[in-house]
Amino acid sequence: APAGMFGTSIEEQRKAWTYYSNNLNQPPPNTMKVWEEIVPGEGFDVPVRIYRPAGAPAAGAPGVVYIHGGGFMKGDLDSSDSVAWGFAEQASAIVISVDYRLTPEHPYPAAFNDCWNSLKWVHEHSSRLGIDPARIGLAGDSAGGNLSAAVALKARDIGGPAIACAAIVYPGTGLDQDYP
């Protein structure tokens, strides 16, 4: 396997990421409904995990498409579980966590396409999910922040789906690395 950062293989990095995230994760509250669905994609069906907090209204709730971090090569639904349900609980929003394809096995634009298809799917299924289609936002950290920003820009450029808000947390969006 090719060496990644820190001279370790990608498999070793993924194993460490999983180990640490599993040890840090906490289970969601018993009152939160959590289930998984599949988003049909272009050559790949995207697994998503949906979190509905007890405080969310039955219809017209805000929705958040959450895209995990991990340098585009690590992370999954389990490693980002606490972050995703935390967003749901704190915002009283229905959160849809996206299990996009990882590099290097799936080079660009695979992850972007998975996230874009997930946003479109949430918009198309908003009524069934109990989400107000005018209140769908994006959230992501690190690589997920990058993907959230890219998905938001595409939605803007082609006229939708409309994005109500974006929580883009320490995104990898600038190559200059010259920050104040």
Pin down the residues of each PLM region.
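Short beta-strand element of the alpha/beta-hydrolase
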Residues: 59-70
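Primarily recognizes the serine-hydrolase "nucleophile elbow" in alpha/beta-hydrolase
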Residues: 117-180
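A glycine/proline-hinged amphipathic helix-loop "lid/cap" segment
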Residues: 1-53
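Short amphipathic alpha-helix adjacent to the substrate-entry channel of hydrolases
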Residues: 78-98, 113
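Conserved catalytic-core motifs of eukaryotic protein kinase domains, centered on the activation segment
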Residues: 76-78, 106-108, 179
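Hydrophobic/aromatic beta-strand patches that form the interior of the parallel beta-sheet core
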Residues: 65, 96, 167-169
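Active-site loop/oxyanion-hole signature of alpha/beta-hydrolase fold enzymes
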Residues: 107-120
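Short beta-to-alpha linker loops that shape the active-site pocket of alpha/beta-hydrolase fold enzymes
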Residues: 54, 99-103, 172
